[in-house]
């Protein structure tokens, strides 16, 4: 029986590593290699080797796009956290009988393609859309306001798509809280705010960091959200990559932008693991 289990484990590990090598490592190495080549009109890329593609990343135009991507993704992440934390906390405190239903409602949007959902959001936010019509009927607005083709529309779209990715890790972290710690804090005279900021918040920080990463990292590359809700006025890093590959046909520079985004994501993941390790050590010491 042990021999069978060992063989099964080896086969499973081999399949996983093979998948990672062929579909993650090799494609990224190819992109890295192309990023050091020169643009060619007929073959997309050619020799000689150059680092000009990476020096172009520091062009003020592209630096502004990176800053816009970080700022809009950061704002969307903060909004997701402010909405997701109370919702996840509520989910963990209701009767266990109703939790599966709420979890089902959280993951239900994943059953529909995100592109179709963004088209629906475009209709919702339009000048003659549901939102403007509802606000006018309620007397809040006297005339429709333009939300589409603005940064606000892009942020709304990012929050709409990525909110479940914030709720799920937060719910997992909050559900694991030891109620005895909260009772002990209450017995020691801690009020509601003190219990939250000194007990609940530190213990759920790994879930907060994980949720922020799961929202922030994909948000920077969702070019179709900026295309449909922001028009030509709002650009994310993903829009630059798409444009360089499909429109400008500058594959080397598009590859360099992709590698730059990958490095940025890797740094953020490294920060997450370091912060998570330090938080766990702090909790153990306390």
UniProtKB/Swiss-Prot annotation:
Membrane-spanning intervals of the chain: 14-33, 72-91, 101-120, 152-171, 200-219, 253-272
Any Pfam family the entry gives: BPD_transp_1
Periplasmic topological segments: 34-71, 121-151, 220-252
GO biological process: transmembrane transport
Location, primary (coarse class): membrane
Gene3D superfamilies according to UniProt: MetI-like
Coiled-coil residues: none
Subcellular locations according to the entry: Cell inner membrane
InterPro entries documented for this protein: MetI-like (IPR000515), MetI-like_sf (IPR035906)
Membrane topology category: Multi-pass membrane protein
A cellular component term, taken from the record's GO annotations: plasma membrane
Signal peptide (from-to): none
Cytoplasmic side: 1-13, 92-100, 172-199, 273-286
Key word Cell inner membrane present: yes
Keywords: Cell inner membrane, Cell membrane, Membrane, Transmembrane, Transmembrane helix, Transport
Record-annotated ABC transmembrane type-1 domain positions: 66-274
Family statement: Belongs to the binding-protein-dependent transport system permease family. CysTW subfamily.
Name assigned to this protein: Spermidine/putrescine transport system permease protein PotB
Lineage: Bacteria, Pseudomonadati, Pseudomonadota, Gammaproteobacteria, Pasteurellales
């Amino acid at each position: 029986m042990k021999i069978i289990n060992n063989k099964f484990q080896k086969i499973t590990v081999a399949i996983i590593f093979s998948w990672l090598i062929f579909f993650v490592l090799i494609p990224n190495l190819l992109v890295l290699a192309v990023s050091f080549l020169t643009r060619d009109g007929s073959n997309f890329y050619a020799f000689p080797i150059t680092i000009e593609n990476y020096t172009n990343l520091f062009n003020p135009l592209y630096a502004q796009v990176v800053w816009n991507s970080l700022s809009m993704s950061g704002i969307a992440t903060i909004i997701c956290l402010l909405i997701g934390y109370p919702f996840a906390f509520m989910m963990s405190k209701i009767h266990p009988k109703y939790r599966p239903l709420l979890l089902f409602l959280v993951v239900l949007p994943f059953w529909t393609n995100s592109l179709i959902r963004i088209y629906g959001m475009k209709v919702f936010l339009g000048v003659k859309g549901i939102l403007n019509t509802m606000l006018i009927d309620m007397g809040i607005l006297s005339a429709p306001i333009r939300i589409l083709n603005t940064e606000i529309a892009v942020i709304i779209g990012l929050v709409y798509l990525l909110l479940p990715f914030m709720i799920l890790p937060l719910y997992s972290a909050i559900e694991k809280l030891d109620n005895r710690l909260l009772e002990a804090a209450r017995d020691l005279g801690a009020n509601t705010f003190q219990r939250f900021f000194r007990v609940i918040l530190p213990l759920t920080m790994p879930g907060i960091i994980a949720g922020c990463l799961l929202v922030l990292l994909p948000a920077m590359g969702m070019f179709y959200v900026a295309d449909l809700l922001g028009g030509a006025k709002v650009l994310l890093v993903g829009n630059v990559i798409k444009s360089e590959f499909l429109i400008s046909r500058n594959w080397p520079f598009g590859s360099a932008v992709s590698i730059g985004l990958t490095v940025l994501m890797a740094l953020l993941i490294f920060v997450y693991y370091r912060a998570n390790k330090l938080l766990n050590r702090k909790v153990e010491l306390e």
